[in-house]
Amino acid sequence: MSVTIAGIAGSLRAGSHTRALLRAAAYDLPPGIRLAIWDGLAHVPPYSEDLEAGPAPAGVAALRALIAGAGAVLIVTPEYNGSIPGQLKNALDWASRPRGGAVLEGKPAAAISASPSPRGGARALADLRKVLTVTGAGLTETELAIPQVHTQLTPGGHIADPALRGRITALISDLAQHATAASPALAA
């Protein structure tokens, strides 16, 4: 099995915990799984149906190409005012278009929320799951809300808690299995 998973961090902040968490997860991947982390969120313009008639803006084209070329998508979101960040929602709006031919339709997807709060961004996780479901993504049942994320990463960029590391690895393995089931060519 060889599966590429598109990793999308929902924060624009350079020192983002969600981006750091994605990078840390890449250190502990099971064999045959690759995490392609996308850093182009800031380059996606506001969604406008008027722009669909012409070529996609460069940031949108890059996002769509990443998702189309991956077997699955893993999104890690912070919680901003009880929901997902606006820029992440905007990117998902672009990836959900055009209806009937969007790169998210049927794509296996998993969601993680991470927050310094004790709830781990659970409200953002619920909203992200709702958005992914509406887009037609093949959302897995496995999900994680990671509380006190600022204490979960080592200065070297690894996941400090072995139990959390195991849960993230299990989520990624489950997502890869969904990708393989959705596209048997990945199992070769």
Predicted regions and their residues:
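Helix-loop-strand module that forms the ligand-binding subsite of alpha/beta enzymes
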Residues: 55-135
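N-terminal beta1-alpha1 ligand-phosphate binding loop
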Residues: 2-33
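Glycine-rich phosphate/pyrophosphate-binding loop and the adjoining helix
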Residues: 138-188
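A general structural signal for well-ordered alpha-helical segments in protein cores
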Residues: 5, 18-22, 44, 60, ...
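N-terminal beta-loop-helix "entrance" segment that forms/cooperates
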Residues: 40-57, 152-156
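Short beta-strand elements in bilobed, periplasmic/extracellular small-molecule ligand-binding domains
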Residues: 33-46, 139-147
